């Protein structure tokens, strides 16, 4: 269905622009970020440049696997979104093009690759989300979990929602958060104690925030900005930034052998601009990477977070073995 949607969207775009005086080849994007953000950003890009855009929105795992499989004949020009370890994976497979944007100098070193194959455009921080009404109904008088270890309370069994790390970069980041803060042995002990308490492992990284917002679960592991957005929209949720959490960045990359390289470079430049990052923050409460961009009211500055020294390269190297172990041990 998604492939059909992408194809039909492309055909529709080509038909529309066939009648224009100047024909421009549409930029094709695989997007991991939310559809609302993707549409707003691509609409603004088209307005600023006149370059038409078509996009396919799907989960991180699905799109990164597609990028790698298509590396010799890419069906898109841009991979938009996804944590750094997934871009490292695609780069190691030879699927990404090197491009240093003029705006890359504004991006801090932790948010870009040394070889200019991927660049971060917003900071993502993992935390705990609470549906206040459901929590207080299920656990009257109980304090909200304030640390990662608090989630191991047996009372929470069935009331926790955590994304499936095999399908989602959000949950894989959580898995690595525990392995890196506790060490391999204690980290796996933690994860295997937590798993039986989880009521649902959806595939989409955005699902926990949504399920918390609708009151289907009391506690969830999610990016803080995703839960904060539901709070701003009037849902009965709270965000908690536990100590020793982890931060990462959503990245953008150009496909190796892109058929529309000039337009792809312009889109990377656009995504690193203050204008694009402020637009994204206004929609989804993400924290801009560009220091000239202002984050939306309600977004949590990086300076106020207790972050571990996250080893991105290690997370990427271990990905296959860690997910294999997860699949074997978590049913």
Describe the residue ranges of each PLM region.
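A bilobed periplasmic-binding-protein/Venus flytrap-type ligand-binding module shared by bacterial periplasmic
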Residues: 129-134, 249-260, 279-280
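Periplasmic-binding protein-like
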Residues: 124, 156-163, 190-195, 201-202, 233-258, 271-293, ...
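Bacterial signal peptide processing site
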Residues: 21-23
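Extracytoplasmic ligand-binding site segments that recognize negatively charged/polar headgroups
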Residues: 28, 32-39, 61, 75-216
């Amino acid at each position: 269905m998604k492939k059909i949607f992408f194809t039909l969207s492309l055909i529709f775009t080509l038909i529309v622009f066939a009648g224009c005086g100047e024909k421009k080849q549409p930029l094709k994007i695989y997007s991991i970020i939310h559809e609302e953000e993707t549409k707003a950003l691509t609409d603004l890009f088209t307005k600023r440049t006149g370059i038409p855009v078509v996009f396919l929105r799907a989960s991180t795992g699905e799109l990164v696997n597609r990028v790698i499989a298509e590396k010799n004949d890419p069906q898109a020009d841009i991979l938009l979104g996804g944590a750094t370890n997934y871009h490292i994976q695609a780069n190691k497979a030879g699927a990404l093009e090197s491009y240093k944007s003029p705006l890359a100098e504004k991006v801090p070193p932790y948010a870009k690759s040394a070889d200019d194959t991927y660049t971060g455009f917003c900071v993502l921080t993992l935390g705990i989300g609470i549906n206040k009404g459901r929590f207080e109904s299920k656990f009257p008088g109980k304090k909200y979990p304030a640390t990662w270890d608090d989630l191991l309370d047996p009372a929470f069994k069935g009331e926790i929602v955590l994304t499936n790390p095999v399908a989602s970069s959000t949950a894989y980041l959580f898995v690595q958060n525990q392995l890196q803060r506790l060490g391999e042995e204690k980290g796996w002990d933690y994860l295997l104690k937590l798993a039986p308490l989880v009521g649902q492992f959806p595939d989409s990284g955005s699902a926990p925030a949504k399920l918390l917002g609708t009151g289907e679960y009391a506690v969830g592991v999610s990016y803080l900005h995703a839960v904060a957005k539901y709070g701003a929209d009037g849902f009965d949720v709270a965000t908690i930034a536990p100590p020793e959490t982890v931060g990462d960045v959503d990245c953008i990359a150009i496909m190796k052998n892109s058929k529309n390289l000039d337009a792809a470079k312009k889109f990377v430049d656009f995504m690193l601009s203050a204008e694009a990052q402020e637009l994204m923050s206004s929609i989804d409460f993400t924290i801009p990477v560009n220091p000239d961009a202002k984050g939306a009211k309600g977004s949590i500055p990086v300076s106020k977070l207790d972050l571990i020294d996250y080893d991105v390269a290690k997370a990427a190297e271990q990905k296959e073995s860690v997910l294999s172990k997860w699949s074997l041990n978590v049913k």
